[in-house]
């Protein structure tokens, strides 16, 4: 497998409403320096594939309104690799579009699909796992998804049940998927944790271009027909005009329902590289450094007194003083201020009306 055949697809069309006020419809969280490290989440996603996928083989699928943001933050990737969705249709049409596009450019392409807003703390292990999976999919017709080894009974993630009794003959770290499970209630999640064959579904996929295109032809023929019909205009001056016309015809469906739960050659690679989907303020608190009282502070002039288990995030050069809070989010961005119990953050979209 030549590294020049490796391609990365970054899905970057989401709004991230659960991270209000930092993340808004005008500038979602993937374009923000959430961790205070000088790089946005989409830039960190791009960075962690260095040495695995050449920059010329990186693709981003995003909403039309974010194309300029992607180009501004990732100037290294070809401009014609930033694909613009005219409307939101979930992950299956997004992946189909870019897969047909990549296959037209390189029929031998091997593809990793990654969300734009996850974080990884052990990048060396991440690269090892991804490279291992790419080698496997280059040699087989398999569809591989990464399964994160759970560290707690999490109810916010879907789970993958693996058959650990038999590893693939080609790769001893990759196993067949028994079943995909929906987000569980707490008692069910606690049962999953007691077993060693349940993994968090990270939404990271690895497959060859020919494998995923064939899977769409078999399991989602209506979506496949749309992109087969427009193959001749892909990578031409007419591409965006035609995509704007036909993309709304695609069914609004996730790749999990469209392909993963139907296909036969589905494998999971259990992994442990410090992963978080960073979907909530609570997940950010769990992934960042705390003071001795369990507080996380991202900001230049923040002072806490008699407070614990709080996350404070400010991007403005303002003095922030907090006293007597336990388990709160305090976040400020562009004149908007959030003060909310961490235990109530699932209601943020309800509170703000955004996302």
Task: State each model region's role.
Residues 123-237, 241-243, 267, 317, ...:
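Conserved core of the sugar-phosphate nucleotidyltransferase
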Residues 2-5, 209-355:
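Left-handed beta-helix
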Residues 10-12, 61, 112-115, 145-149, ...:
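Short beta-strand segments
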Residues 42, 98, 117, 160, ...:
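Residue-level signal for inorganic ion chemistry
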